[in-house]
């Protein structure tokens, strides 16, 4: 994988990530396609209507259903989903912990039961790489030991040592397999304890294709999260992409970009869309509310998304109230367009050395309805 930094504005970075299936401009937001698709959207929506280059799929879910070997026999995840961009797959460790009963954390992996049928499974650092090789992921995440916050210092220390050990095992295994098109990212843990974050970076070997800041947006305050990012990002290699996992709001994303983060994913735009919350540059609106019943204007004037060019808030209000499946698609198209345009505009501002003023202007307008 080739990552080229094109511009730096203070700490904000703009770059190019060259993957075998696509060239990705950073900062980048990755829509979350847990089951190999973005809920209610298909590959044509992602490619032609949203111009998405990189999306996230979940190793745990793909492994349990339909099975990574099924996907491999059908030509890999790209052919299976007919998505001609790139896929990042997470390790599945978080889902093994959060969705399963009777999870057992061991020094060499995670024992868990399927949330589908109760069958017993064992994820190890090499097992999750084998699954992701079968999926033919462009970017693969190592197995890590994620800790919810707040957590005792002893548990954080256990987590970072175990995560670093698993990451280093993964790196050596990946080198042995010689799979240059499947790039491997490490994950830095440590909660909001800055010394633990530094230790995590120090214990994790160099040589990964990228580095993720994990273990955030799991119960800490926004200030704690930003302080942790500000401390951790400068410790990571400057010539490698930096990925903040599972974050977040438009404000969070712009703050993290200003701290040197390049990549983001979150279910927020699509989950909020399905639950009637739509993003605009003047803040969020709830399309289910009565005032939109006779509102013949688009979600946002001057928005160029597929939905806003064709449909009114009144129509979307009706679809939501009628529980029509089409609502989820149209709302998700708008919210993802909003997020993808946000990082695209942030990138342009970095290239033009005006990111801080762009961020200030965006946040002033976006939050004005909360004053």
Curated annotation (Swiss-Prot):
Its EC number is 2.4.2.29. Its cofactor is Zn(2+). It comes from Helicobacter acinonychis (strain Sheeba). GO terms for biological process: queuosine biosynthetic process; tRNA-guanine transglycosylation. This is Queuine tRNA-ribosyltransferase. It comes from the Bacteria. NCBIfam families: Q_tRNA_tgt, tgt_general. Zn(2+) binds at residues 303, 305, 308, 334. Transmembrane segments: none annotated. Pathway: tRNA modification; tRNA-queuosine biosynthesis. One of its GO terms (molecular function) is metal ion binding. Substrate binds at residues 90-94, 144, 189, 215. Homodimer. Within each dimer, one monomer is responsible for RNA recognition and catalysis, while the other monomer binds to the replacement base PreQ1. Catalyzes the base-exchange of a guanine (G) residue with the queuine precursor 7-aminomethyl-7-deazaguanine (PreQ1) at position 34 (anticodon wobble position) in tRNAs with GU(N) anticodons (tRNA-Asp, -Asn, -His and -Tyr). Catalysis occurs through a double-displacement mechanism. The nucleophile active site attacks the C1' of nucleotide 34 to detach the guanine base from the RNA, forming a covalent enzyme-RNA intermediate. The proton acceptor active site deprotonates the incoming PreQ1, allowing a nucleophilic attack on the C1' of the ribose to form the product. Residues 246-252, 270-274 are annotated as: RNA binding. Keywords: Glycosyltransferase, Metal-binding, Queuosine biosynthesis, Transferase, tRNA processing, Zinc. It catalyses: 7-aminomethyl-7-carbaguanine + guanosine(34) in tRNA = 7-aminomethyl-7-carbaguanosine(34) in tRNA + guanine. Gene3D superfamilies: Queuine tRNA-ribosyltransferase-like.
């Amino acid at each position: 994988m080739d990552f080229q930094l094109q511009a730096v504005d203070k700490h904000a970075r703009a770059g190019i990530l060259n993957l075998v299936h696509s060239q990705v401009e950073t900062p980048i937001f990755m829509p979350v396609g847990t089951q190999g698709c973005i809920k209610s959207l298909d590959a044509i929506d992602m490619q032609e209507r949203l111009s998405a280059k990189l999306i996230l799929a979940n190793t745990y879910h793909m492994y349990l259903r339909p099975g990574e070997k099924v996907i491999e026999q059908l030509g890999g995840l790209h052919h299976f989903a007919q998505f001609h961009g790139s896929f990042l797959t997470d390790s599945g460790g978080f889902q093994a912990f959060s969705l399963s009963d009777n999870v057992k954390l061991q020094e060499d992996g995670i024992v868990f039961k399927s949330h589908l049928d109760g069958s017993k499974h064992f994820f190890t650092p090499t097992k999750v790489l084998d699954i992701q090789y079968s999926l033919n992921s462009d970017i693969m995440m190592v197995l890590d030991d994620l800790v919810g916050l707040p957590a005792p210092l002893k548990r954080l220390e256990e987590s970072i040592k175990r995560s670093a050990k698993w990451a280093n095992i993964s790196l050596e295994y990946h080198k042995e397999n010689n799979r240059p098109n499947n790039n491997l990212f490490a994950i830095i843990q440590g909660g909001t304890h800055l010394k633990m974050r530094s230790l995590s970076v120090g214990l994790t070997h160099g040589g990964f294709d990228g580095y993720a800041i994990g273990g955030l947006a799991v119960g800490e305050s926004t200030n704690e999260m930003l302080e942790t990012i500000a401390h951790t990002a400068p410790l990571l290699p400057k010539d490698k992409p930096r990925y903040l996992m599972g974050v977040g709001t438009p404000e969070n994303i712009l703050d993290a970009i200003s701290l040197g983060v390049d990549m983001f994913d979150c279910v927020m735009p699509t989950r909020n869309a399905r639950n009637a919350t739509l993003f605009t540059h003047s803040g969020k609106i709830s399309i289910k509310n009565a005032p939109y019943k006779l509102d013949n204007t688009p979600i946002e004037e001057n928005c160029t998304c597929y939905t806003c060019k064709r449909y009114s808030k009144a129509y979307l209000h009706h679809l939501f109230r009628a529980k029509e499946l089409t609502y989820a698609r149209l709302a998700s198209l708008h919210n993802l367009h909003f997020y993808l345009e946000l990082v695209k505009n942030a990138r342009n501002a970095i290239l033009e050395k005006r990111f801080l003023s762009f961020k200030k202007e965006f946040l002033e307008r976006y939050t004005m309805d909360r004053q």
